[in-house]
């Protein structure tokens, strides 16, 4: 515990091993079989328990939970472990759970990784180096992730899947199979199915104008001619419909993104 900076409200169990220059913030809880290597920093409210090792220069943000038992019914309190390498950034509410008897008794994370808010790494996962998991990525058990892989926010990966090196998974993607190295995987994006007619009715919009606006967007997104011409034609045709005019104004504004594709 040489030169370590430990807040007075932190709870560190007897037996925990701390390296040099470890910083432990307010209300952190450290179990008796935890090893924190040199220059590890726990911001506050971090819970690390079980047989867990955190590599040097790793920074863990508030409310992260590392080394808790796996979420499986057949877990029988076996002495499994969680090993996290060096130079990792583990943001708020990340959970990394210990291994199980059916997966080698260890969950392992490599070096130089970024795990954004709310990431879940399930039991027996093996994560490589230099990966990026965006917000709320969820990995089930027994998943292997290769070096330099990127997983977009709110994506979920099925148990036992393999994510190859240098691959990328787009946001909101349910991944139920292996992803090859260098592969690009993405789920179907949200599509425009019509107008929020029920919500518009509840807010007092005129029903006739709302239905007319629905017809107008069908003409804009699936009519003949190019998109700009269709917008102009619809603006002229429905110039007395305030709902359509509001939509047209939105379509004519500058944007760095495309519009959601229309599917009736």
Swiss-Prot record:
One of the GO BP terms on file: lipid A biosynthetic process
An annotated GO cellular component: cytoplasm
EC number(s) reported in the record: 2.3.1.129
Enzyme class: transferase
Pathway: Glycolipid biosynthesis; lipid IV(A) biosynthesis; lipid IV(A) from (3R)-3-hydroxytetradecanoyl-[acyl-carrier-protein] and UDP-N-acetyl-alpha-D-glucosamine: step 1/6
Matching SUPFAM superfamilies: Trimeric LpxA-like enzymes
InterPro entries according to UniProt: Acetyltransf_C, Acetyltransf_C_sf, Hexapep, Hexapep_transf_CS, Lipid_A_LpxA, Trimer_LpxA-like_sf
UniProt KW keywords: Acyltransferase, Cytoplasm, Lipid A biosynthesis, Lipid biosynthesis, Lipid metabolism, Repeat, Transferase
Family matches, as PROSITE patterns: HEXAPEP_TRANSFERASES
Superkingdom to which the source organism belongs: Bacteria
Principal subcellular localisation of the protein: cytoplasm
CDD domains: LbH_UDP-GlcNAc_AT
GO molecular function, one term: acyl-[acyl-carrier-protein]-UDP-N-acetylglucosamine O-acyltransferase activity
The reaction(s) this protein catalyses: a (3R)-hydroxyacyl-[ACP] + UDP-N-acetyl-alpha-D-glucosamine = a UDP-3-O-[(3R)-3-hydroxyacyl]-N-acetyl-alpha-D-glucosamine + holo-[ACP]
Family of this protein: Belongs to the transferase hexapeptide repeat family. LpxA subfamily.
Assembly: Homotrimer.
PANTHER family: ACYL-[ACYL-CARRIER-PROTEIN]--UDP-N-ACETYLGLUCOSAMINE O-ACYLTRANSFERASE, ACYL-[ACYL-CARRIER-PROTEIN]--UDP-N-ACETYLGLUCOSAMINE O-ACYLTRANSFERASE, MITOCHONDRIAL-RELATED
Function: Involved in the biosynthesis of lipid A, a phosphorylated glycolipid that anchors the lipopolysaccharide to the outer membrane of the cell.
Name of the featured protein: Acyl-[acyl-carrier-protein]--UDP-N-acetylglucosamine O-acyltransferase
Originating species: Rickettsia africae (strain ESF-5)
